[in-house]
Amino acid sequence: MGITGSLTPDQLDFFHSQGYLVIESFASEDEIRGLRKRMDELLNQFDCSVSSIFSTKNQKHTTDNYFFESAEKISFFFEEKAFGDDGKLKQPKQLSINKVGHALHELDPLYKDFTYSSKFSSLASSLGYRRPVVMQSMYIFKQPGIGGEVVPHQDNSFVYTDPQSCTGLWIALEDSTLVNGCLWAIPGSHKNGLVRRFIRGDNGITFDQPSPSYEQKDFVSIEMKAGSLIAIHGDLIHQSFENLSSKSRHAYSLHVVESDGCKWAKDNWIQRAKMPEPLYVLP
């Protein structure tokens, strides 16, 4: 099938030089409203007696079968600070979930329609993909008051192919600001290559190298209006701080890899019985 790329030469130049690109008004108000409404429905149906705690600081969830099995399911992960000393939720479950993942784009019809729409195919085509596959999808809440920090990282660490091919696509479903925990990145850091990998072995998952230290002065804040999308190169160093405000920061995030000539690593944390359906296939 023929796919027409949606990015201009200037946009592509910025992406390749800086390692990221913000596209405003990527999602319409109706699409945002629909995605958020559907997530409310999923949360209301969710049995919170079966779940896991998510943290990028403490990787204890990585030995959790619930986490492994989420690769091909719609699974719910609590914020670290959602529970009191008595082990009970300190607020309603709707305000306690860190994220929902990792197969929304396959298993929920509304999220699948949005993910497999022509706008994502056009974007992937502009970025040079021939047979792009969405390996994971996440709805991220960044809850008010307890939304956890996401430490500096590279997406290729977690979503690794040989050769490397990951691009993160992150859509703001609410305004993302300095107040509620917007993204930060080190422009051009993707040119330095991959620092470390997150590897699944017999004893769970660990990083193969310690985390480097980064100077906060090297990061720039990336504030975004609801409906905007940021494309993130797989080697770009990026992070977000805790959300200590009274406002949430909902987002829908995808990680795309090339399946034409790129091999999915057997020691990635995501190991699936079947690869997802590609967004499109070029001849």
From Swiss-Prot:
**Obligatory cofactor(s):** Fe cation; L-ascorbate
What is the name of the protein in this document? Phytanoyl-CoA dioxygenase
InterPro entries per record: Phytyl_CoA_dOase-like (IPR008775)
Q: Which SUPFAM superfamilies match?
A: Clavaminate synthase-like
First and last residue of the signal peptide: none
Q: Which organism is it from?
A: Arabidopsis thaliana (Mouse-ear cress)
- Record bears the keyword Ubl conjugation: no
- Effect of knocking it out? No visible phenotypes under normal growth conditions.
**What EC number(s) does its UniProt record assign?**
1.14.11.18
Role of this protein: Converts phytanoyl-CoA to 2-hydroxyphytanoyl-CoA.
**What keywords sit in the KW lines?**
Dioxygenase, Iron, Metal-binding, Oxidoreductase, Vitamin C
Report whether Metal-binding shows up as a keyword of the record: yes
Pfam families per the UniProt record, alphabetical: PhyH
Output the lineage of the source organism. Answer: Eukaryota, Viridiplantae, Streptophyta, Embryophyta, Tracheophyta
- Name the enzyme group at the top EC level: oxidoreductase
Tell me a GO biological process for this protein. Answer: fatty acid metabolic process
At the top level, the lineage of the source is Eukaryota
Extract the GO molecular function terms from the UniProt entry. Answer: L-ascorbic acid binding; metal ion binding; phytanoyl-CoA dioxygenase activity
Q: Which reaction does it catalyse?
A: phytanoyl-CoA + 2-oxoglutarate + O2 = 2-hydroxyphytanoyl-CoA + succinate + CO2
Sites binding Fe cation sit at: H153, D155, H238
Q: Which annotated residues bind 2-oxoglutarate?
A: K99, M138, H153, Q154, D155, W170, S240, R249
| Sequence similarity | Belongs to the PhyH family.
Involved pathway(s): Lipid metabolism; fatty acid metabolism
